[in-house]
């Protein structure tokens, strides 16, 4: 929501992640046999309603569909997480997620903080690799 509106061929575009934060439905529609979904939040994460919705309603009042997407984003996100959990339990997909909450500002330029987060990701990837290899070998 912090990004600027993009205009292309006289159409206005905003961050597509608002309407479809985890585009897994598109992925499954492609019909691939093995699917890997990479999440940015640890297991058990639940997205909460946006606390600044009153302000966003005013700022984007001329874009009612965008406001509706913002208002329901947490519901859609959480429903997608539920679907992914069901598919993961059934062995239909492999989900990669961080082992802990990784909170980093959008424009972080602190080398030590970026290194810390990188190391978490690297450790998690190495820990996940055997299970991922087994999933892909099935």
Regions found by a protein language model. Give the residues of each.
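Patatin-like phospholipase
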Residues: 3, 8-138
